């Protein structure tokens, strides 16, 4: 599975901009909360910490991890032969959502502490969901015979 870094960082920017814009009781919230290109160094650290969290959660299934030149990150998992391939796309989406939510949670720990815990919990749940899907085995089907 590959997580496209540019897509994740775009979603992080959208999420932080939205959160900053929607705060009605704080005039400086948007400027404080919105993650910009100037914050890339810190966001890069959070990107790497999210990779580590995925590897830790999926360490029994982990075969390899690789980073591309453009910063994208790929992980190869060893899954059961009974793994339901229909879950692959859902796993990829959930993994991408984990990265966005995890990075936003870590960012909010600095600039929006009220929402940081909720985002952290959501990130944990997303990663657990990826792990559950990786462990899921499709029930065997009985062979059918033509009479």
Task: Place the predicted regions along the sequence by residue.
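Conserved short "hinge" loops at termini or chain/domain junctions
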Residues: 1-78, 84, 132-147
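Short loop/turn elements at secondary-structure junctions
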Residues: 18-21, 30, 93-147
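Amphipathic protein-protein interaction modules
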Residues: 68-111
